[in-house]
Regions:
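N-terminal phosphate-binding caps/lids of nucleotide- and nucleic-acid-binding domains
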Residues: 1-319
Length: 319
């Protein structure tokens, strides 16, 4: 008798969740990315107990029709790519079709959505990957997703979650990244019913003021550089903005927050003779490069990317 067996689709999703969904932060990241891709102008995020108890992301985006709402929670179902060629020109934040089924397989999830321009919305409820109900949901706008009891059915994963305060700080840091990369979108974030952020759409400069205070704008230095085929824009801070810790350095590649030591070091090099060792400057920089010259399908968290010519980009930034 064969000892090799095909895994059930739900078990496959739970295994995939180990890669895609590590903690409450991961859930919020995937859901907010979907809201941005859905052309939302307002995104509201609510968490309880650092996401241990519940996480909610509500938006006013284009929403989903009835059949798409069901299909969205099937693995590798996505509206964002269709062919292998599309992988070379990804211009959305999400694209794999793994996040929603992974989240649904390890939580108690409710997803409500209504297609823009329609009057009939629907609510899908899934517990541990098993669909419980699919019913009409009147009075909706956009998409509303509620995730409760993350990893409730995988105790070994749940016990490794960080303390609620730690998870909350990580989520606040994430939402700050989203707010800076999308100043044209209004955001609100509340934790345990207490408002943390509530910002309206505006410019990058006004968004920085919203986060860091009105006086902070006096310390900003605008950056604008175009060197075909690259464009760099944003702000760096003067010496008044330096801190003895990292965390206020934001590099966005085609609208996506990335972590790249080499490219960040290009910015640091400009400050090397001006600041002490162990001090870090403030910057919010947007790098626009051709989609086919970067591979974002490198890491499940999509924070790491691979460039065709990273050293050339390094010298463009350094200049």
């Amino acid at each position: 008798m064969s000892k090799i067996k095909l895994l059930s689709s739900n078990l496959v999703n739970q295994i995939a969740a180990g890669e895609v969904i590590e903690r409450p932060f991961s859930v919020i990241k995937e859901l907010v990315e979907n809201s941005i891709d859905a052309k939302s102008s307002q995104i509201n995020i609510m968490i309880e107990e650092g996401g241990h108890k519940s996480l909610q992301v509500f938006d006013n985006g284009i929403g989903m029709p009835k059949d798409d709402l069901k299909l969205a929670f099937k693995r590798h179902a996505t509206s964002k790519i269709e062919t292998q060629d599309d992988l070379a020109k990804i211009n959305t934040l999400g694209f794999r079709g793994e996040a929603l089924p992974s989240i649904a397989s390890v939580s108690q999830l409710s997803a409500k959505s209504i297609e823009h321009g329609h009057t009939d919305g629907f609510e899908l409820t899934i517990h541990g990957g098993e669909a419980k109900s699919f019913v009409p949901a009147p009075g909706l706008s956009g998409t509303q997703i509620t995730v409760k009891n993350l990893f409730y059915n995988i105790p070994a994963r749940r016990k490794f979650l960080k303390k609620p305060d730690t998870e909350q700080r990580k989520i606040i840091e994430l939402i700050r990244q989203f707010m800076l990369s999308n100043p044209g979108i209004g955001f609100s974030l509340s934790a345990n019913g207490k408002e943390i952020y509530n910002v309206v759409f505006g410019t990058l400069e006004t968004r920085i003021k919203d986060i860091y205070g009105k006086n902070f704008s006096n310390s900003l230095l605008p950056v604008e550089l175009s060197k075909t085929p690259y464009k760099i824009s944003g702000f760096t801070g003067n010496l008044n903005t330096t801190k003895k810790r990292q965390g206020d350095q934001f590099l966005f590649l085609n609208g996506r927050f990335i972590k790249d030591r080499l490219l960040s070091s290009a910015v640091f090099s400009a400050y090397r003779s001006l600041i002490s060792r162990g001090e870090f400057p403030f910057f919010v920089l947007f790098l626009q490069i051709p989609l086919d010259s970067v591979d974002i399908n490198v890491h499940p968290a999509k924070l790491e990317v691979r460039f065709q010519n990273e050293w050339h980009i390094y010298h463009v930034i350094k200049s």
